[in-house]
């Protein structure tokens, strides 16, 4: 298992919204809490504070466990 780097929340949101993930915020999102949905993937509840660092463990959890990517695909998205 790879050790994923911590990244800024703004960058993580950009990754989740880009290809191949294509997550979008659902209409009932409020404030800094975004419910991100994508066809064929689990929804992700994202706490968006743009300058906050997201730990590598959470980055891996979002991309591998929630979004359904392999570790290799997730690693390539963030590098």
Annotate each PLM feature.
Residues 1-28:
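N-terminal first-folded block
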Residues 5, 51-52:
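Short amphipathic alpha-helix initiation/capping segments at coil-to-helix junctions
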Residues 6, 14-15, 34, 61-64:
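General helical structural elements
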Residues 29-33:
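Short acidic/glycine-enriched loop/turn segments that link adjacent beta-strands
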Residues 36-40:
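Active-site beta-strand termini and strand-to-loop segments that position acidic
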Residues 41-45:
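Short, charged/polar, Gly/Pro-enriched secondary-structure boundary elements
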Residues 52-79:
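C-terminal structural segments of small proteins and small subunits
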